Amino acid sequence: MLIVTTNEIPGYRIDEILGSVWGLTVRSRNIVSQFGAGLKSIFGGELRGMTTVLIDSRNQAMQRLVEEATARGANAILAMRFDTSEIGGMWTEICAYGTAARVSRLNS
């Protein structure tokens, strides 16, 4: 699966646009890590536990994005983006989205 943040892929022709696809995950924050993050924010520095959760969440959202595009018969995702939002102060939503497409390599 080719995944790009652009609307086109150099060296490829877009044969068919299959529509919008997305992968979503919502994660709750652990009370202990929230407390630790609160203390860390007072003194400064990276919130490693939260960073790890966000990396894992983005990876899961990407995996779900690819699964949906594959189910539609796509071999590429164009204009891929991430959106992150907080829900109720306790959950983090991560959404990966883009346009599923069938592409083919141009003759050189």
Curated annotation (Swiss-Prot):
InterPro entries: UPF0145_dom_sf, UPF0145_YbjQ-like. Pfam families: YbjQ_1. Transmembrane segments: none annotated. Coiled coil: none annotated. Belongs to the UPF0145 family. PANTHER family: UPF0145 PROTEIN SCO3412, UPF0145 PROTEIN YBJQ. HAMAP family: UPF0145. This is UPF0145 protein Acel_2109. It comes from Acidothermus cellulolyticus (strain ATCC 43068 / DSM 8971 / 11B). The lineage of its organism: Bacteria, Bacillati, Actinomycetota, Actinomycetes, Acidothermales.
